[in-house]
């Protein structure tokens, strides 16, 4: 559901030149929903990898299990907040507004998929060109956001069945995955550092080592997959 909210907001942003600002209230409500979904989804991603890594620990396992247990308890708190949001009148109103938009908007956007994809590709290219040889974590995260936006408009083009757009989608998804793995590792290390205590120190240190290895791997690979995505994108929108 969080992916759907992000995709919808990205498409609203991309179609602003065609549709104007009339969907901005919907975008704001989708942002609210994404904010409710985010903490649970982020913890799901983090816990999925930590459970596997902690199970492979030896002497440090008890400390690792303590970290996992605290994160699981935090997830339950956020899950309760999410369920409250999904049961609210605000969510029901959002659902009705979104459904109405789906009924009316597609006709206005017929034939614009290639134009939308080309616009987001240009922004993706510009962002990629601005990334220095040794980017900061924030610079890579910003590039990831542009990759996601490019992906969502590319998916519109792929709905036409054009093979070049299908190949573009595959390539930009690969780029997003590599850069996303870097951001996941950054977030994981931050969370682990916040949970360090004397009895967890060895486990946290070992888990942080694994996250840093993921970051190094992503940094070594991201430029190649980004360049491939841009190449595929140029072919798709030509």
Show which residues each predicted segment covers.
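Function-determining surface determinants
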Residues: 1-238
């Amino acid at each position: 559901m969080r992916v759907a909210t992000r995709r919808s907001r990205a498409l609203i942003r991309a179609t602003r030149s065609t549709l104007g600002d009339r969907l901005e209230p919907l975008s704001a409500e989708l942002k609210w929903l994404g904010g409710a979904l985010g903490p649970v989804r982020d913890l799901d991603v983090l816990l999925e990898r930590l459970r596997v890594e902690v199970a492979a620990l030896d002497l440090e396992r008890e400390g690792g299990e303590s970290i996992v247990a605290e994160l699981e308890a935090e997830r339950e708190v956020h899950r309760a907040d999410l369920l409250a949001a999904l049961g609210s009148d605000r969510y029901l109103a959002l659902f009705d507004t979104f459904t109405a938009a789906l009924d009316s908007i597609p006709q206005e956007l017929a034939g614009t998929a290639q134009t939308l994809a080309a616009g987001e590709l240009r922004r993706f290219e510009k962002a990629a060109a601005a990334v220095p040889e040794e980017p900061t974590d924030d610079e890579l995260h910003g590039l990831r956001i542009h990759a996601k936006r490019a992906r969502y408009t590319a998916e519109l083009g792929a709905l036409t069945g054009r093979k070049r757009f299908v190949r573009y989608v595959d390539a930009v998804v690969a780029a997003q995955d590599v850069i996303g793995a870097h951001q996941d590792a950054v977030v994981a290390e931050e969370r682990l550092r916040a949970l360090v205590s004397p009895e967890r120190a060895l486990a946290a240190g070992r888990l942080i080592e694994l996250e840093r290895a993921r970051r190094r791997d992503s940094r070594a690979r991201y430029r190649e997959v980004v360049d491939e995505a841009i190449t595929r994108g140029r072919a798709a929108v030509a």
